[in-house]
Structures are given as structure tokens and as C-alpha cells.
């Protein structure tokens, strides 16, 4: 049994996601998403480790930090896409307004390289507007409440499952730069879910 140091647990917080590097058989790298405490503040981060032949953890590297955390809605699913990039589902940390805030990593699906860099074709790559407004370049889509699943179909489309408020769970087809509506009031300028449970839960 591996023990991950520094994991903080509270309600929905804790050790939330695991992904193996696409070349895990050769490089033994894997990634975890977990809640921790840094400088007295609760936060979520993605960390990479290498697994030795003796089942020990080495070469720790923080791939992404500063993901808002709460006792609810921490997201936490991570997976490598067919394009080789790491996708990270984050919850709104029980603060719906953050899902629409492009300066926050909360309530988003993020996309980064295996080293934590920004892919050049992300929707908010570096330019004067992005830099001036402090938009997070890791963002791939936004307006999410608490996405809990990531999967790709045979055509390469990304799908996500998401917890809604009091049921209203949904399945979304994720598109680059898409706004999925959480945190908006009285607006229809967002992408409708592919499927919704309505007042029931699946």
C-alpha cells in the first residue's frame, strides 16, 4: 500500500484522482489529484511521482497547484486524452461564481502537458488580453459545478459526467472553450447538456 504524504481529508476532500502516464510501462510516472494544506490554506493540487521497482515514490513534482478547495465540490478526475495531454476536472469548491471566473481554476476542465506546461492550442493561450486580465491558460472549458468523470469516444470526443444541484446530474460533450453554464443566472449563452437526469439522479 502506497501512502501519499500531505493529503487532507474533509467531507468530499482528499485523494481524488489518479492517472498513469501514457508511457507508464517505460517511465513509471503517475499523477494524483488531492487536497492538501499549504500555508494554512486548504487547496487542491496535481502532483507527479515515479514508482520504483521497490514500490517507493520518488521524483515528486507539483504539476499544477492553486486549485480552489472546499469541503464540497472538489472535482478531482484526471485522465490523459488521446492527444497526450492531461485533462483535470475541478469543482467550484462550493462557490458557484468561480465556475464563470476565468481567473480561477475552479469549476473548469483544465488541459496541460505531462510536465505541467500550457499546450499551444488551448483556448486561452498567452496574448495581451489574456495576460492583462490574468486569465488561466490551463482552462479548456468552464461553467462546471462538480465534474466527476472524463472519457473519450472512438471519434476522439471528450465527455464528462457532472453532479448537479439536488439531482439534475448531466452528461456533457466537452468542446474547447465551451461554457457549460454553472454560475450563470437567467442566461442561455451556454452549452446544453447532452443528457440530464432532471429531478432524478442516476
What is the role of each PLM region?
Residues 13-15, 23-25, 92-202:
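Beta-propeller domain segments
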Residues 1-97, 149-164:
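Acidic, Gly/Ser/Thr-rich repeat motifs that build Ca2+-stabilized beta-propeller blades
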Amino acid at each position: 500500500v502506497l501512502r501519499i504524504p500531505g493529503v487532507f481529508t474533509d467531507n468530499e476532500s482528499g485523494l481524488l484522482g489518479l492517472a498513469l502516464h501514457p508511457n507508464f510501462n517505460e517511465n513509471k510516472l503517475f499523477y494524483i489529484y488531492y487536497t492538501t494544506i499549504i500555508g494554512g490554506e486548504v487547496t487542491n493540487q496535481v502532483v507527479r511521482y515515479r514508482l520504483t521497482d521497490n514500490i517507493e515514490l520518488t521524483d515528486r513534482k507539483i504539476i499544477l497547484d492553486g486549485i480552489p478547495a472546499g469541503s464540497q465540490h472538489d472535482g478531482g478526475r484526471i485522465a490523459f486524452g488521446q492527444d497526450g495531454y492531461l485533462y483535470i476536472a475541478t469543482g467550484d469548491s462550493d462557490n458557484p461564481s468561480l465556475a464563470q471566473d476565468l481567473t480561477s481554476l475552479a469549476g473548469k476542465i483544465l488541459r496541460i502537458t505531462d510536465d505541467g506546461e500550457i499546450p499551444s492550442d488551448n483556448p486561452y493561450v498567452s496574448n495581451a488580453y489574456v495576460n492583462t486580465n490574468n486569465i488561466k491558460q490551463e482552462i479548456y472549458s468552464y461553467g462546471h459545478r462538480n465534474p466527476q468523470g472524463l472519457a473519450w469516444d472512438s471519434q476522439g470526443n471528450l465527455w464528462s459526467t457532472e453532479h448537479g444541484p439536488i439531482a439534475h446530474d448531466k452528461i456533457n460533450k466537452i468542446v474547447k472553450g465551451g461554457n457549460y453554464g454553472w454560475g450563470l443566472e437567467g442566461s442561455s449563452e451556454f452549452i446544453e447538456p447532452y443528457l440530464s437526469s432532471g429531478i432524478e439522479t442516476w
